[in-house]
Amino acid sequence: MTIYLKNSFLLFYLVLVSFPIMSSNIIVPNEEILEKPFPLPYERIELSENDLRNFIDKTINNNKQPVVIFGANWCPDCRILSAVLDLQTVNKYMEDNFEILYIDLGRYDINMSLMEFFDIMPQQGIPRVVILNKDKEVLNIKDTGEWTTARSRTKQEIFNYFQEYKE
């Protein structure tokens, strides 16, 4: 009988650990699809470090986390990332928790010094996403380039990324 119990316990344990751990992440409904044409979120406006600091301060004062996204409208990955952030479920979550500043890099001829503000090497591609906490610390400094391949990722992967960094 003890061998039977041991085997039963072992089988129960294997079944238990083989189930994926349930995530607390919000799921993007299948019916929410990316609408074409994709957004053009970048305006050719030159910003200063002072503008960037003001955005960060204002966002934190509004009890939200600042998100800065460097990119350009010619970049398909930038536009796809923006389209995912515009999905109803994602947009609601982002508006409740974050404030986003899209910074146009043009053809790498505008606002490049603002990437250096965060110690980001500009030659590593776009979009570059910077997520800060309410203490003005960059939370994702090691993977700001995660979405330079946004077009090969799912909308849920993109949404999960932002959910992981919410304070």
Located regions from the model:
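Bacterial N-terminal signal peptides that target proteins for export
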Residues: 1-9
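N-terminal leader/targeting and pre-domain segments
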Residues: 25-62
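Short active-site neighborhood of thiol/selenol oxidoreductases, capturing the structured segment around
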Residues: 62-75
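The canonical Cys-X-X-Cys-His
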Residues: 75-79, 129
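Typically the conserved alpha-helix immediately C-terminal to a functionally engaged Cys/Sec
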Residues: 79-93
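Thiol-based oxidoreductase modules, predominantly thioredoxin-like and allied folds used
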Residues: 94-112
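Non-catalytic, surface beta->alpha helical segment in thiol-disulfide oxidoreductase systems
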Residues: 124-167
